């Protein structure tokens, strides 16, 4: 996931092409403009300019991934006949992902057919996925949409996951991990005496919204099914290594998920 206003586009072109080559064409490319005004300002970016910078940086990135020489004249970035020596293995470029929760950005993602991932309660994400699908349906045949090489976009929802042999063990691990995860998410805001996002990421909110899914394989399987059904998504993005979870806990969680949860969702 690259916050484009924080990167020099020409260097990013080279990094993306190299990553796709090294991974054998398995790179999935997430792009965004950033949601924290404090983070943007730390990099010398005016939050008011982040939308325009994102649009220009994305145009430069995609041009550089698909052309032999790069020329671009914008308000924020300018390049003149720059040779591009390395290109991605996937053509024309790796599939694009766009995480968002604002109506305008959701329409933008759907219009271009970006793979999309939403946050928050499944019911709220359902509104977003419905809006995405409307935009996608209206623009799927547009010749100039940016993710045109992706025939069926992934419409995802993000969840933090802990699977253990017993429900109580999974809950204890999730509670402990969440304390540090919460501090890391809110730290920069708190340094500016801003607590406006605390409620979005509290343990109580996570339980209410099912943004953290924990339990035995049976419990997690049921929760995953409910999330997928209620959200209208066709893809669930799971994070197994977060907060203070040890490598052993994360690997055990992932193993249980793969062996005892995923088979229930096999499609053929």
Regions from the language model: what does each represent?
Residues 1-268:
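Active-site-adjacent structural elements that line small-molecule/cofactor binding pockets in enzymes
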């Amino acid at each position: 996931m690259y916050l484009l206003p924080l990167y020099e586009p020409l260097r990013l072109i080279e990094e993306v092409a190299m990553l796709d080559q090294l991974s054998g064409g398995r790179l999935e490319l997430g792009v965004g403009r950033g949601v924290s005004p404090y983070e943007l300002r730390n990099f010398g970016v005016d939050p008011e300019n982040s939308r325009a910078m994102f649009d220009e940086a994305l145009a430069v990135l995609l041009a550089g991934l698909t052309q032999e020489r790069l020329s671009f004249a914008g308000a924020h970035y300018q390049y003149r006949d720059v040779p591009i020596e390395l290109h991605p293995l996937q053509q024309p470029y790796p599939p694009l992902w766009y995480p968002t929760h604002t109506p305008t950005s959701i329409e933008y993602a759907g219009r271009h057919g970006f793979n999309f991932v939403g946050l928050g309660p499944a019911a709220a994400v359902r509104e977003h996925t419905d809006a995405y699908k409307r935009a996608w349906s209206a623009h799927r045949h547009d010749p100039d949409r940016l993710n045109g090489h992706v025939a069926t976009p992934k419409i995802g929802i993000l969840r933090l996951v802990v699977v253990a042999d017993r429900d109580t063990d999974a809950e204890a691990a999730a509670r402990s991990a969440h304390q540090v995860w919460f501090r890391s998410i809110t730290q920069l805001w708190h340094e500016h005496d801003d607590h406006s996002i605390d409620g979005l990421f509290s343990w109580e909110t996570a339980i209410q919204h099912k943004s953290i899914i924990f339990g035995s394989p049976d419990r997690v399987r049921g929760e995953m099914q409910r999330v997928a059904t209620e959200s209208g998504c066709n893809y669930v993005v799971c994070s197994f290594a977060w907060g203070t979870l040890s490598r052993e806990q994360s690997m055990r969680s992932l193993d249980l998920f793969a062996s005892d949860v995923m088979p229930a969702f096999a499609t053929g």
